C-alpha cells in the first residue's frame, strides 16, 4: 500500500514540475522572438500632404522603419470629402529598409471623379515585407492636412 502511495505522490510531483516548466517556457516565446531579431515593420503617416496639379494628386509624407530583407511595399490611400462627393486616391512605393526612420513621399493619384482640395483628409498607410523567416504588415490611419 505504501509503495502505491509513494508512486502516486512521485507521479503527481513530476507532473506538476513538468507542467510548470512547460508554462514557463511557453510564455517566454514572444520575448525570445522580440530579442532574436524578428521582423519589424512600422509606418507613420505625416502631415501636411502637398496638393498637386489642381487636385489630380497629393504627395503624402510617411516615415518608414523596418528591418526586412530587400525592399518593402508602402501603399497609401487618401479619402476626402469634396463638395457633394468624395475624392479618393491610391499610391505606392518600394522602399529599402535601413533599420531606422526613413522619410518617404508617396504620390497618391485621385481615382474618383472628384479632385483633392486643400483641407482635411483621411490617409491610410500600409507597409508589408519579409525577412528570412516570416512576412508581415502594419497599418497607420491619420487625419492629415492637404496644403
Where are these regions (language model features)?
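Short glycine/proline/serine/threonine-rich loop/turn segments at secondary-structure transition edges
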Residues: 112-122
Amino acid at each position: 500500500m505504501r509503495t502505491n502511495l509513494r508512486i502516486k505522490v512521485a507521479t503527481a510531483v513530476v507532473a506538476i514540475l513538468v507542467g510548470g516548466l512547460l508554462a514557463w517556457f511557453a510564455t517566454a516565446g514572444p520575448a525570445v522572438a522580440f530579442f532574436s531579431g524578428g521582423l519589424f515593420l512600422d509606418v507613420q503617416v505625416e502631415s501636411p500632404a502637398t496638393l498637386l496639379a489642381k487636385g489630380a494628386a497629393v504627395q503624402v509624407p510617411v516615415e518608414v522603419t523596418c528591418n526586412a530583407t530587400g525592399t518593402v511595399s508602402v501603399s497609401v490611400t487618401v479619402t476626402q470629402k469634396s463638395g457633394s462627393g468624395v475624392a479618393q486616391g491610391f499610391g505606392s512605393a518600394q522602399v529599402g529598409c535601413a533599420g531606422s526612420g526613413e522619410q518617404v513621399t508617396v504620390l497618391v493619384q485621385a481615382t474618383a471623379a472628384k479632385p483633392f482640395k486643400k483641407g482635411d483628409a483621411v490617409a491610410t498607410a500600409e507597409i508589408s515585407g519579409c525577412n528570412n523567416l516570416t512576412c508581415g504588415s502594419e497599418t497607420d490611419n491619420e487625419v492629415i492636412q492637404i496644403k
